[in-house]
Amino acid sequence: MKLVLVNCGMAMGATTQSFDKHVLLRTHPFFKDLGDAVIDRLAPRVITTKVAKGAVIFRKGDVGSKLYAVRAGAVRISAPSEEGKDAIFNLVVPGELFGEIAFLDGGQRTADAVPIENCELMVIERRDFIPLIRDNPEVAIRLIKI
């Protein structure tokens, strides 16, 4: 199978260092403006899991109930093109998120997510995040601006 690289987001020289969940929540644009009280409520709900190289995290068409952040390793986001080639949309490295669109709208995944090396991921369940939005309308407003 031939790979086609499309808009690869991995920076030159990016490393696979680890990121703590509090650091990620306080510094990533998706979360940083949520405020300490919301982040302190969310952090205990973040789980850490290990995923082996080549294991499928999700496939195009799966329902998006989780948001992922890479803590260590790297994840390829891709989908088959009409020509049957695997088009790579992004390589997600430590400190970056993936799966946020389907996570927020509860819709279907638009691509596959597969680690290109052994990974450690931080995972937030939609069912844990939505009550924070419901209880804190300003959180929803901030997310809309992102």
Regions from the language model: what does each represent?
Residues 1-146:
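Cytosolic regulatory regions built on CNB/CRP/Popeye-like sensor folds
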